[in-house]
Regions:
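C-terminal beta-strand-loop-alpha-helix "lid" module of Rossmann-like NAD(P)-dependent dehydrogenases
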Residues: 1-286
Length: 286
């Protein structure tokens, strides 16, 4: 059985750990609030430009535009957004599980140290690695978007996918992999077919013409999609870290309480034993 001194030392150590995790929880909570606001505020613009692409797609020959044209090959480029630091619960491990299910010839662009280390360790082809700043802006996304578009237009890859953690709420973040290029996939084609009548009934005017507008909008669309993904990845990271640190603090506090009860029980038992020894000795002396 552990001695009183050992238990007391453990209580102190665990209490100090709880203080550290609580401080990290508060820091993560402050960052989480800002990141969540940025991710939420970016969604309306992302939806608007997405709707614009859909509207134009109903007025043009989709196969004539390289960023819309579909390919039957299996060469893929995956843009993988992870975190630079750990202590974010199961966030990165969920991403790694999604990644392991990928098949075919795959290249990777990574943003986040955890992801780049995993790719290198797995022996996969790493095309480029980018830092993911604490407060990302759209400038961070430009080189990522450029490489993705260039690789696709040069036909070095047949599809471009993004793997990231989609932000839903503080308690829910989901590892998601979805197609970025070509922009029109099978699912969107079905949706466009059902929306065609609505678009025809609602006349749209594109100046100077739909093709010219599309040429200008498509690169901006890719850039904004990547930027929105970065914002959601950051919101997910800070949310997961805040929850993980909160759980760690609560677990440490519970363990410290249990050890305190054990400490008090052993101490009380020792005191009772001493009293009994003194009483026994006193009776023996009478």
């Amino acid at each position: 059985m552990a001695t009183l001194r050992e238990i007391k030392r453990r209580i102190k150590s665990i209490s100090n750990t709880a203080k550290i995790t609580h401080a990290m929880e508060l820091v993560a909570a402050a960052k989480m609030k800002r990141a969540q606001e940025s991710a939420t505020n970016g969604k309306p613009y992302s939806k608007l430009i997405n709707d614009t692409i859909r509207s134009i797609a109903n007025h043009i020959d989709q196969a004539a535009h390289p960023l819309l044209a579909r390919s039957q090959g299996d060469k893929s480029l995956v843009i993988f957004f992870s975190t630079d630091r750990g202590l974010a619960g199961s966030l990165n491990s969920n991403l790694f599980r999604e990644l392991e299910e990928l098949v075919g010839k795959t290249k990777f662009i990574t943003a986040g140290k955890k992801g780049s280390r995993f790719i290198v360790k797995s022996g996969k082809e790493l095309l480029a690695d980018f830092p993911l700043p604490e407060k990302p802006d759209i400038a961070v996304c430009r080189p990522i978007a450029k490489i993705a578009i260039d690789e696709f237009l040069k036909k070095n890859v047949d599809q471009v996918h993004v793997l990231y953690t989609e932000f839903t709420s503080t308690l829910k973040q989901t590892a998601v992999i979805r197609q970025l290029l070509p922009i029109i996939d099978e699912e969107i084609l079905k949706e466009l077919a059902t929306e065609a009548e609505e678009f025809q009934a609602r006349e749209s005017l594109f100046e100077p013409n739909p093709d010219t507008v599309l040429e200008a909008v498509l690169p901006q669309y890719i850039l904004m999609e990547i930027y929105q993904i970065v914002l959601e990845a950051k919101a997910s990271e800070h949310s997961a870290r805040m929850v993980a640190m909160k759980n760690a603090t609560e677990n440490a506090s519970d363990l410290a309480e249990d050890l305190t009860l054990t400490y008090n029980g052993i101490r009380q038992e020792a005191i009772t034993k001493e009293i009994l020894d003194i009483s026994t000795a006193a009776i023996a002396l009478e």
